[in-house]
């Protein structure tokens, strides 16, 4: 292995090590004040069938995501089966539990490997660059949907959640993104545009530039596949169903704590658990949105980041003690982690045998 390749490997290793260390720090900050005897007692007395329902909602979201992605892939390669796309989604999510963001690239490889050959027989119809472009478009839709739901909730429920959003999200965001940062961002955008134009102008001068141009072109074809779908309304329905499942995942976990026997807990702890269990559907929607923000933190599987952000929101908005908020965060996160592990392992076996 050359020194250059070793340097790249070392940089990636450091990147993932820092990511894992950040997750450990956030987990420590989240659980350092937890009284483990009461924490375990609270988990034991919850209604586990509601937790299973949350896991099933998670699996349903994987399936709807696969069907939505299949619609984006159809203009590129209509022969890709729903099973293959579902397996790709599951394997990607499984990979993200260990290596953040890497799963998005892995699932593209699964699709390409199973794609039919092109007319010239030199590559697959769903080449890697085109599939990656569909993932870029899919994730862009997720961000737009999240922003739309967040704005709707803030407009209709500002009196309840506005203080938390302003103090914990808007002010830190505004403090980090001053004028200099926006100029830097604009400069990077212009640099990217200039780079693309340069590659296009010089595409016939060397094989390397020609290959790079081909990759960028394929990536763009994947992005614009969204506008070539015959049934765009189905894409929107699947998007709505995905976020409906996310909301159900949050609401069912709240239901799992409703009416539980808290006699084994201390008076203060049991009172806080009871307040937590009384939260309704709109609160579940807010917690879903807050939990989604944890994906911005580059840690494996959202470990630590999800727990800390959600417990902080429960403490700030509802006055629920942080250690009690951790119970909800743990049930929410770990139930979905188990669902991802089971589906990911099953899909990996399925792809290995195909």
Regions found by a protein language model. Name each.
Residues 57, 91-100, 286-307:
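Transmembrane alpha-helix interface/packing and boundary motifs in multi-pass membrane proteins
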Residues 57, 65, 69, 96-107, ...:
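Alpha-helical transmembrane segments and their lipid-water interface positions
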Residues 111-118, 222, 286, 308-324:
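Interfacial segments of multi-pass membrane proteins
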Residues 74-76, 97, 108-123, 313-315:
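Helix-loop junctions at the membrane interface of multi-pass solute transporters
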Residues 67-68, 106, 248, 305, ...:
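Transmembrane alpha-helix boundary/hinge residues in polytopic small-molecule transporters
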Residues 1-90, 156, 161-292, 328, ...:
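Predominantly cytoplasmic-facing regulatory/coupling regions of multi-pass membrane proteins
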Residues 67, 71, 82, 90, ...:
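Transmembrane helical bundles of ABC transporters
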Residues 82-87, 104-105, 117-139, 143, ...:
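Membrane-interface alpha-helices at helix entry/exit sites of multi-pass transporters
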């Amino acid at each position: 292995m050359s020194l250059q390749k070793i340097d790249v490997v070392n940089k990636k290793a450091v990147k993932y090590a820092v990511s894992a260390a950040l997750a450990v720090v956030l987990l420590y900050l989240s659980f350092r004040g937890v009284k483990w005897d009461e924490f375990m007692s609270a988990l034991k007395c919850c209604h586990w069938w509601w937790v299973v329902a949350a896991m099933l909602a998670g699996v349903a979201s994987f399936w709807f995501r696969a069907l939505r992605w299949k619609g984006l892939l159809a203009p590129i390669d209509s022969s890709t089966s729903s099973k293959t796309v579902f397996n790709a989604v599951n394997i990607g999510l499984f990979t993200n539990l260990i290596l953040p963001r890497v799963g998005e690239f892995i699932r593209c490889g699964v699709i390409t490997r199973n794609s039919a050959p092109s007319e010239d027989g030199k590559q697959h119809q769903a080449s890697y660059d085109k599939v990656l472009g569909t993932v870029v478009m899919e994730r862009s839709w997720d961000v737009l949907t999240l922003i739309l739901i967040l704005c709707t909730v803030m407009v209709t429920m500002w009196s309840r959640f506005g203080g938390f959003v302003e103090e914990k999200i808007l002010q830190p965001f505004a403090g980090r993104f001053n004028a200099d940062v926006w100029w830097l961002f604009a400069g990077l955008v212009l640099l990217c545009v200039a780079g693309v134009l340069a590659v296009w102008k010089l595409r016939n001068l060397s094989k390397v530039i020609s290959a790079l141009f081909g990759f960028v072109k394929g990536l763009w074809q994947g992005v614009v596949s969204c506008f070539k779908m015959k049934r765009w309304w189905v894409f929107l329905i699947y998007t709505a169903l995905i976020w409906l499942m996310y909301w159900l995942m949050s609401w069912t976990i709240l239901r799992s704590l409703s009416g539980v026997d808290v006699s084994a807990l201390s008076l203060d702890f049991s009172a806080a658990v009871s307040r937590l269990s009384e939260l309704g559907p709109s609160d579940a929607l807010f917690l879903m949105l807050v939990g989604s923000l944890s994906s911005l933190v580059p840690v494996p599987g959202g470990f630590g980041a999800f727990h800390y952000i959600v417990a902080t929101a429960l403490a700030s908005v509802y006055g629920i003690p942080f250690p009690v908020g951790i119970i909800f965060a743990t049930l929410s996160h770990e139930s979905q982690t188990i669902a991802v592990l089971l589906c990911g392992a099953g899909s990996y076996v399925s792809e290995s045998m195909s």
